[in-house]
A protein has these predicted regions:
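Short-chain dehydrogenase/reductase
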Residues: 44, 48-57, 88, 92-93, ...
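C-terminal substrate-binding subdomain of Rossmann-fold SDR/epimerase-dehydratase oxidoreductases
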Residues: 81, 100-219
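Residue-level signature of the cytosolic catalytic core of signaling kinases
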Residues: 31, 47, 87-91, 150, ...
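A generic local structural motif
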Residues: 4-7, 61, 95-96, 158, ...
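Short, hinge-like loop/turn segments at secondary-structure boundaries
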Residues: 36-38, 93-94, 189-190
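N-terminal Rossmann-like NAD(P)+-binding domain of SDR-like oxidoreductases, especially those catalyzing
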Residues: 1-82, 102, 112, 124-127, ...
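Gly/Ser/Thr-rich beta-alpha loop segments that engage phosphate groups in nucleotides
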Residues: 5, 30, 86-88, 94, ...
Length: 219
């Protein structure tokens, strides 16, 4: 939140256009599927995951307030799960975790049943969406979902990684952390309309192959 306030203050002073990289986490554990930008979310503001989620929601509020009260030129995007080469192998995200475990032939850890779903977006598609968002006119500020609507369970993701790495890993299940969303999928209709027909070009298997190659070369 402090970072948002500082950069908004700077944008106000120098009359700069500013982009907020918000997140699909603002939707919480959604009861609407897929999630459009008009959905206000199903959130727990005091849960163990809520600090990040609520920080992003508060930042969106600050961006809108600076836009309404000070005329700051803002853009807001809501980024869904993104992966690709140059990820930190130890960043704790599910794609990097699964790939590293598979390359080392370690057990792949899935929390809960593994039937919870996510939508995975390749980094190049995200960058293209961000670039197009910044090129839109001042009459469109967002928020707009930037994500891949392809939806996969954690079990499906784990099996794809095992197959693509020819790994001997087994899948093990651990207790599900509290407040873990059961499903996540973007409605990208608005992005397609406002961002010059933007939609993801790299599907999961192709993106995983590129990411696995990078990790293999940097182990």
């Amino acid at each position: 939140i402090y970072g948002a306030m500082n950069t908004l203050g700077l944008a106000k002073r120098i009359r700069a256009k500013i982009l907020q990289a918000s997140t699909s986490e603002v939707y919480g554990d959604p009861e609407v599927h897929p999630q459009p930008e008009s959905y206000w979310g199903h959130v727990n503001p005091i849960g163990i995951r809520s600090c990040y989620d609520e920080g992003k929601r508060a930042a969106e509020t600050l961006f809108m307030d600076y836009y309404r009260q000070n005329g700051v030129r803002i853009k807001i995007i809501r980024i869904f799960n993104t992966y690709g080469p140059r990820m930190n192998p130890n960043d704790g995200r599910v794609v990097s975790n699964f790939i590293m475990q598979a390359l080392r032939n370690e057990d792949i850890t899935i929390y809960g049943t593994g039937l919870q779903t996510r939508s995975f977006q390749y980094i190049d598609d995200l960058i293209e969406g961000m670039t197009r968002m910044m090129a839109t006119g001042d009459d469109f500020i967002g928020p707009v979902n930037i994500g891949n609507p392809g939806e996969f369970t954690m079990l499906e993701l784990a099996q794809k990684v095992i197959d693509l790495t020819n790994s001997r890993s087994s899948i093990v299940h651990m207790p599900l952390p509290g407040d873990d969303p059961q499903q996540r999928k973007p409605d990208i209709s608005l992005a397609m309309e406002k961002l010059n027909g933007w939609q993801p070009q790299i599907q999961l298997e192709e993106g995983l192959k590129k990411t696995i190659t990078y990790f293999e070369n940097h182990l």
